[in-house]
A protein has these predicted regions:
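A metal-dependent hydrolase signature that marks the N-terminal structural subdomain at the beginning
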Residues: 1-117
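Hydrophobic (often cysteine-bearing) scaffold residues that line and stabilize catalytic clefts
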Residues: 29, 125, 152
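Residue-level recognition of short, structured coil/turn motifs
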Residues: 42-45, 141-142, 165
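Basic amphipathic recognition helices
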Residues: 117-121, 126
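Active-site recognition of the HExxH zinc-binding catalytic motif
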Residues: 126-139, 156
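Substrate-binding clefts and substrate-entry loops adjacent to catalytic sites
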Residues: 138-146
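Post-HExxH zinc-binding segment in Zn-dependent metallohydrolases
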Residues: 147-171
Length: 171
């Protein structure tokens, strides 16, 4: 008989917090991310190595987050704390922002997004769930990917909706 003890609970992916861009914040803390991950089925996290909070490099939402298939990690980018300016905003993103409580104001040269209370946290929880959806899709796929980008995004959105319901039920 082996003297090693098997771990019955699968460990969560590592959460790494880097400094946000100057003037930005990370809406989700590492502790909040761990709490979200702990509420998800272990199968969804299988193979996910790391979630990293990172400074955004470019404009807000370009992108909000990124799943890197080869590295099996998720990058969540920093955001301005009060008001975001974006040159454009597609309908799906606007719908998700409004659902999280954002007020969207259209201007001549772009769009401003304003959050009150914990709305930005709710939005980033959905973004994280969407990226986990990409991870789940890539874990299940046995053959080379042939799906179009629109199909990949639809699967990730479906996963985000299911995760949102699961997290709401656990709260």
């Amino acid at each position: 008989m082996s003297r090693t003890t098997r771990q019955t609970r699968t460990s969560l992916p590592r959460v790494v917090a880097r400094k946000p861009r100057r003037g930005d914040v990370h809406p989700l803390t590492p502790a909040a991310i761990r709490q979200i991950l702990a509420a998800l089925p272990v199968e969804q996290l299988h193979g996910l190595r790391r979630i990293e909070l990172r400074a955004r490099v470019d404009d807000v939402g370009d992108p909000f987050a990124l799943y890197r298939r080869e590295e099996q990690d998720i990058l969540l980018y920093s955001l301005p704390p009060d008001e975001w300016w974006m040159s454009s905003l597609d309908r799906a993103c606007a719908r998700e922002l409004r659902r999280a409580g954002a007020r969207i104001v259209r201007h001549r040269h772009g769009v401003s997004i304003h959050f009150a209370g914990g709305g930005m946290d709710l939005f980033m929880r959905d973004v994280l769930a969407h990226e986990i959806g990409h991870h789940v899709r890539n874990q299940v796929a046995r053959y080379p990917r042939t799906a179009r980008t629109a199909d990949e995004e639809a699967v990730a959105d479906l996963h985000a909706r299911r995760t949102r319901v699961r997290l709401r039920d656990d709260a």
